[in-house]
Structure formats: structure tokens, C-alpha cells
């Protein structure tokens, strides 16, 4: 009889915990003036079948990297390591442009396929076949694609579902916000162990994100570290204690929803991103001038009128992105 009670207790408490998390999620969304149960959409493969793409009902574009350790389309039971090749960069580029030109998209969400990896970076087997000149243009293409992502005036969130190393971290660093899944996963730029450097934006972005001294230590040692350490240095913004991959997807979608219409002023978010991205590279007085121009643009927008009027009337604004 006691054994039966233990079994019932073992099956009961996990359900209670899940219900409690759902209630807390609804409370969080209610505080934001929204209750949206948007779910993970059906994703469809891009041309080379190395990226899956889809858009949620509330305007979150999902770009999912999916390949094996050779950088080939995932077949059978091969582990999704999500390494990239030139063909994957073409798919990533096409997905970014699809999201950029879609007026219904407010947020771009990057993630990796499977339970283990966000991305392990470039396929070493693929790179080993290339000439030095080809590798140079390979890095240039990656630079251009990630710069396009950074210059898209929509918030970009990287959902780090697993190991994020090498070029995988370089992709993640081009996002505006990085959210990791709790687990025994590693982060790092170990390229020095191959006799090269992190050449698709690693040295440039890491030094800007964590500072020169910390970036140097990470890259010259090539060491890998945990998401917790990454969070301590502000390389990762948050770590979600999601029990399953599906729950992690839902948790990140719920967070992403706060940046979607009509709950967030998408035009203002885009201008904030433009000011931060472009302004850091110019003298302060020019940055202030850019800021004024972007603010002037917003003052003339319908969203600014909506937001200011709602504040005066003590109402919740509903933005249209105009």
C-alpha cells in the first residue's frame, strides 16, 4: 500500500510543478497586458535543407540551424551538431531577408535543432577541403550575413539550446539578446587549438561584449566554459531552467512575445537598435545627432502618439508599428 502511495506521489508532484509554472507564466504575461499562448510553428526547410524557417501567429520568425557534423542535411539518426558550410550561410541569409521584409515579423529567433547543440561552428571536414582563398571568401560571406542580421531593425534573440562553441558562439554574438537552456553545456572560441582565430566575427564581437582583457583570455587559451560563467560576464543574458527542449522553446517564445505587436512599439525598438549598433562606431557628438534624428522620426509616428496618449489616459497602448 505504501509503495502505491509513493508511486502516486511521484506522478502527482511533477504535474503540480508543471501547473504552477503554467500559472506563473500566465501571470507574467498578464502583467505585460497580454495573454498569448502562441506555440512553436511548423518549420519548413530552406533551399539547401540546412535551415528551417517559420513564423508564429504573433510575428516571431524562427531560424533553426540543422545539420550533422559534416555540415550536411540531417539524415536518419545522426546527431544535430548544426555545423555550417557555405550552403548553410546561404540558407541563413535567405531566412534573415525573409524576416526583414516581412512586415508581420517583429522578432527574429535563432536556435539550433535538437537537444545537444546550438551550433558547433564551421564543419572542420568541410574547411579542410578548401583553398586558403576560398576560406577567405567563406569568412567574408559569414561576416556579411551576420552584419545583415545586426543591421536588421528588429530584435534578434538567440535561444541557446545546447553547446555553443566556435562559429556557433560567433552567430549567437550577432544577436541582441542571448537566452540559454540550463544544462551541462559549453561555450567558447577554441579556434586557437587549430592554429587559427575566430574569423567569422569572434575577435571583433567578443571584445566588444566582454571587454578586451576577458576576450583575450578566452580566445588565447581556447578554453570552454559554462552558461553560468557566460552569464556572469554578460555574454548570456538569462538561463532558463526548462525541463525539456519543448518547454525551453515555449519559454523563449513567451519572452519573445513581449517585443511583438500590439504589445511593443516595434518601430521604436528598431530605432533603438539602429542607434546602438551604428552609434558605438562613431564619435559621441555624431551618435547624439543620430539619436536626435531617430527620435524625431519616432515623434512623428502613429505609435508615439498612441503611446503618449495611452500614458496620459492611464490606458494600455496597442501599437501598430507605424
Q: Where is each model-derived feature located?
A:
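Well-ordered beta-strand positions
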Residues: 177, 217, 221-223, 229, ...
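Glycine- (often His-adjacent) and acidic-residue-rich active-site loop
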Residues: 67-79, 112-145, 164
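Short alpha-helical scaffolding segments that buttress acidic/His motifs in well-ordered protein cores
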Residues: 218-219, 272-276, 311
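Conserved CoA-thioester-binding segment of acyl-CoA-metabolizing enzymes
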Residues: 9-12, 16-111, 147
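CoA-thioester-processing core
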Residues: 145, 149, 159, 165-219, ...
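An acidic, glycine-rich surface segment that forms the CoA-thioester-binding/catalytic face
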Residues: 87-101, 124-161, 204
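C-terminal long alpha-helix characteristic of the crotonase
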Residues: 180-185, 236-289, 302, 318-322
Amino acid at each position: 500500500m505504501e509503495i502505491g502511495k509513493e508511486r502516486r506521489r511521484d506522478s502527482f508532484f511533477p504535474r503540480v510543478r508543471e501547473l504552477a509554472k503554467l500559472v506563473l507564466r500566465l501571470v507574467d504575461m498578464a502583467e505585460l497586458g497580454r495573454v498569448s499562448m502562441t506555440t512553436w510553428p511548423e518549420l519548413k526547410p530552406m533551399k539547401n535543407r540546412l535551415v528551417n524557417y517559420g513564423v508564429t501567429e504573433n510575428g516571431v520568425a524562427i531560424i533553426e540551424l540543422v545539420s550533422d557534423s559534416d555540415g550536411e542535411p540531417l539524415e536518419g539518426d545522426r546527431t544535430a551538431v548544426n555545423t555550417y558550410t557555405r550552403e548553410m550561410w546561404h540558407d541563413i541569409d535567405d531566412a534573415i531577408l525573409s524576416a526583414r521584409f516581412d512586415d508581420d515579423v517583429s522578432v527574429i529567433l535563432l536556435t539550433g535543432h535538437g537537444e545537444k547543440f546550438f551550433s558547433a561552428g564551421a564543419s572542420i571536414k568541410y574547411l579542410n577541403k578548401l583553398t586558403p582563398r576560398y576560406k577567405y571568401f567563406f569568412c567574408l560571406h559569414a561576416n556579411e550575413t551576420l552584419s545583415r542580421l545586426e543591421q536588421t531593425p528588429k530584435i534578434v534573440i538567440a535561444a541557446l539550446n545546447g553547446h555553443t562553441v566556435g562559429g556557433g558562439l560567433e552567430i549567437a554574438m550577432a544577436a541582441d539578446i542571448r537566452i540559454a537552456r540550463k544544462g551541462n553545456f559549453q561555450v567558447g572560441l577554441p579556434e586557437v587549438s587549430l592554429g587559427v582565430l575566430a574569423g567569422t566575427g569572434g575577435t571583433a564581437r567578443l571584445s566588444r561584449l566582454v571587454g578586451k582583457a576577458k576576450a583575450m583570455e578566452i580566445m588565447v587559451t581556447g578554453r570552454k566554459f559554462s552558461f553560468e560563467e557566460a552569464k556572469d560576464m554578460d555574454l548570456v543574458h538569462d538561463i532558463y531552467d526548462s525541463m525539456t527542449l519543448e518547454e525551453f522553446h515555449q519559454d523563449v517564445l513567451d519572452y519573445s512575445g513581449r517585443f511583438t505587436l500590439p504589445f511593443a512599439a516595434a518601430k521604436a525598438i528598431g530605432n533603438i537598435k539602429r542607434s546602438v549598433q551604428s552609434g558605438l562606431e562613431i564619435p559621441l557628438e555624431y551618435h547624439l545627432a543620430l539619436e536626435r534624428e531617430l527620435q524625431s522620426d519616432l515623434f512623428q509616428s502613429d505609435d508615439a502618439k498612441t503611446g503618449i496618449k495611452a500614458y496620459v489616459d492611464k490606458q494600455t497602448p496597442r501599437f501598430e508599428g507605424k
